[in-house]
């Protein structure tokens, strides 16, 4: 019924907000534990040779990895995922070096607020 539709909508809005939050946080050079550690000297040299920025560290080279982050929701849950298996593997490697894929405490509070506010509109 309407509660199920409202729950799906609330989960969808929360998931969409978290997708943007991860992308914005990463673009600012921040992971789950604060500021990313710097690139290695060799990688800085490589990035410079390709005309890429070297600071802040933001996991952005071609843009494909972050662009492949999407979300889906149903009446029971929402999830964020990578639409490309190659980009998912790349994300796992970057996450191992500089944890970024997940939800910070602050982001969790935002998700809770969005979900509750959306659900309260119909209850």
What are these regions (language model features)?
Residues 1-123:
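Short, Lys/Arg-rich flexible segments
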